[in-house]
Amino acid sequence: EAIGELAARYPSARVVALDAALPMLQQARARSMRGRSLLARLLGPFGRGGASAPAFVCADATSLPLPGVCVELVWSNLMLQWVNDQPRAFAEFRRVLKVGGLLTFTTFGPDTLKELARAFARVDGHTHVGRFVDMHDLGDMLVQSGFADPVMDMELITVTYPSPDALLAELKSIGATNQTRGRPRGLTGRGRRAALEAALLALARDGRIPATFEVVYGHAWKGEPKRTQDGLPIVKVERRHRG
């Protein structure tokens, strides 16, 4: 859906959609094709009005298969929280951006799924919910990666679910798997699952189970380079004209 909206917002631009998970990428491509007319599908890569249709690439954010200085906008929606090396991803975003290009993204902050973490704490001593990065640390990463004028913001959104199964099923559908170092190595048994469901039901309000999502918003620009590729500082000298 977002890919189609970006293509509609920038009709003369070439949109490249990247995802490390091939099934998610295939779903995005199918949704994009459903949103296009028969004529647009027949035109294939030329899209409508001469604009290129979106390209779909299976790739990792920390190793983009794109040449340097080739895009004007990097748009990332709820992806960075699944990346193990976020500074490296930011460095890759900056590498492919043109000078004056914009990075804009959303990700999850530390208070995300705090209710689920509390419920799991009653079940065992393992870590089940990811440790999401604070927005101030993300801002520092942007600066260290060479971005200019970073702006960060956040909001807390609480979604409620009718049952533990509904909550856990939705988390699975968005790819929220447990990749923390403290995760249990064995499968979740029936007893542990029942204990988790009971702990979640104990947190219910008005018969619904809350799940908090701390959504972090950020954007930053790629400014003029301050150093050469050899690491030497770039000093600009302007000639003054005598009046």
Give the role of each language-model region.
Residues 11, 84, 98:
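Short conserved AdoMet
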Residues 100-166, 173-187:
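Conserved catalytic/acceptor-binding region of the Class I
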